[in-house]
Amino acid sequence: MAARVEAATMGGEIDEEESDERGSMWDLDQKLDQSMDEEAGRLRNMYREKKFSALLLLQLSFQSLGVVYGDLGTSPLYVFYNTFPHGIKDPEDIIGALSLIIYSLTLIPLLKYVFVVCKANDNGQGGTFALYSLLCRHAKVKTIQNQHRTDEELTTYSRTTFHEHSFAAKTKRWLEKRTSRKTALLILVLVGTCMVIGDGILTPAISVLSAAGGLRVNLPHISNGVVVFVAVVILVSLFSVQHYGTDRVGWLFAPIVFLWFLSIASIGMYNIWKHDTSVLKAFSPVYIYRYFKRGGRDRWTSLGGIMLSITGIEALFADLSHFPVSAVQIAFTVIVFPCLLLAYSGQAAYIRRYPDHVADAFYRSIPGSVYWPMFIIATAAAIVASQATISATFSLVKQALAHGCFPRVKVVHTSRKFLGQIYVPDINWILMILCIAVTAGFKNQSQIGNAYGTAVVIVMLVTTLLMTLIMILVWRCHWVLVLIFTVLSLVVECTYFSAMLFKIDQGGWVPLVIAAAFLLIMWVWHYGTLKRYEFEMHCRVSMAWILGLGPSLGLVRVPGVGLVYTELASGVPHIFSHFITNLPAIHSVVVFVCVKNLPVYTVPEEERFLVKRIGPKNFHMFRCVARYGYRDLHKKDDDFEKRLFESLFLYVRLESMMEGGCSDSDDYSICGSQQQLKDTLGNGNENENLATFDTFDSIESITPVKRVSNTVTASSQMSGVDELEFINGCRDAGVVHIMGNTVVRARREARFYKKIAIDYVYAFLRKICREHSVIYNVPQESLLNVGQIFYV
């Protein structure tokens, strides 16, 4: 039978009209390469939101201080100096600035993030990619359409249906209608992610430098160069110990930050009582109006400094996965919010009496008897705040990698207890170099603060736009509520953004340059990955042609198992046809392995593998889809190959039982665990079924064949036990991992920018990134690379 190349299909589901256009050959392919609906349908959606006792909730609220609120809590170190970098001209400006700080903390962190945005988590996961994953599950907005309807049966895959004429359904259709809208949404997510990465550079720089700046207050003879040197030493030490993880010292974070909040609140109350109680009138919003009424560009640009009072909220949302939302809400409303209000009010009271001390307002407002203890606490709190932001950056990079938007880098799991604690070596050293460059280059808080504020306000704008879609598609709120939330958020954030535009030439350009560099890398990588996937879809080979070659595939079937890795969940990849065209032999058992990342935070181990048979039994061909969420890691101790074979053996056993009368289906797919198999068999005679199951209770109970024939068994009626022995014998003979070593190039007629992106940038990124064989822990002696060139 002549070879045939199928046209690409980017969707997992194919409607009836498309099916009619494909004709009988497509129908034949579907019969030979059956879907996994039956298998996936067996999986019960067991996700339930955890409920916590009051005591445990208070404990988690306390622990959340060290992970979630360190960055937001250290803002008093530098806010007033960045608000009035040129000094204070009118004492009433202090009241106006304090009023702006109070209502900024109320509107953005408290009302928007803690009580609205944090509820838009993906099974407890936060960050821009978590919001994007939610949208991908409720609308077909992924640019790489490798999802299938069976993926929706995962216990962690939650979604809702829409009424056909609802506002949500209309918005969904509008998003899905054009590829340009999907692309724009992805770029929006990437911009937000890149800004958070920039935040991971700027937060340690400004926090540690501000904390170290306290040395000059009590030791005035020390030069600024010494302060910068001390800050750089602390930063190098901080990044150098990242590979140890925070598991061992993480228990210290919450007490340190808790002590910090109590200290700044106590000092704030002391300063209010001692210096000026009239600052409490700043709780009236009328002073905001008077502040701007006095006019002047300086008052408008001072919003850039006010903006720093709410920095850390982006890390708050990104680090949300460690704690339940209710714990985060309690910690903010009971401890963080009142302590910050007291701290800022106390500084304002001190500055009202000593306006010349605005540059070092925090340290100068500390009573002399507790100065050095506060310096130590401030430095420790700055380190904890930096650690939280660095950890959030690692998490976002991992999420971007899982979505195909970041080059393959090494990800290390640093804790056996907590899934979310990871370390990305390459990103860590890049962050350290850039952080030191920013600290040593600017040498002062003002310009770093301008850069920091620019990054944060852009992340807030991105979050607002994504939240608008979440409220429509996921929460299905009334359009009036959506409009109120969006308009109020954009009015506040665009006001801050307009003020930050005046700071671009004063350091605000730094996050833009950093974000542009990371955005270029992430977009080119995603574009190259997308084009490669489209090429594979277009060049996949018909199953009808493969099976038309007969059980031997027109080759010599040699003992062993061939695991053919592909990104396709259906059809035969081009790599396999290329392999059998150029080599005269193929393994007795062939398994097409598709490792797929889904827009869910995790895939339970018992649902990891989907297995099915391809064609008649005597072909000994199978397909295995390994599914991962964006938080799942490929670890060395995963035993990927072992678990794959366990799923394959379990499939063959269950298929044999079904053929014995339990099912009319010729092909059957299973996923996972013996308990699921027992549940499946529970409908019949329990004792008889369990006796049958116990016969195959373990792989070791199967007697391996000592010699494997070099030809495939001709009979399609091979029993389940015989086939298990055959596959196990082939496994003992040797397992070979067949992977594509593809080179992606732009076509000659491609545009200039596409040639630059594919032939140079993407090629360079692929050259320096990790190979799939390393990620999947494939032994080099069992690896077979098949070279190909893809022209896109």
UniProtKB/Swiss-Prot annotation:
It is a multi-pass membrane protein. It is found in: Cell membrane. Residues 1-23 are annotated as: Disordered. GO terms for cellular component: plasma membrane. It holds the Pfam family K_trans_C. One of its GO terms (molecular function) is potassium ion transmembrane transporter activity. Belongs to the HAK/KUP transporter (TC 2.A.72.3) family. NCBIfam families: kup (TIGR00794). Probable potassium transporter. This is Potassium transporter 11.
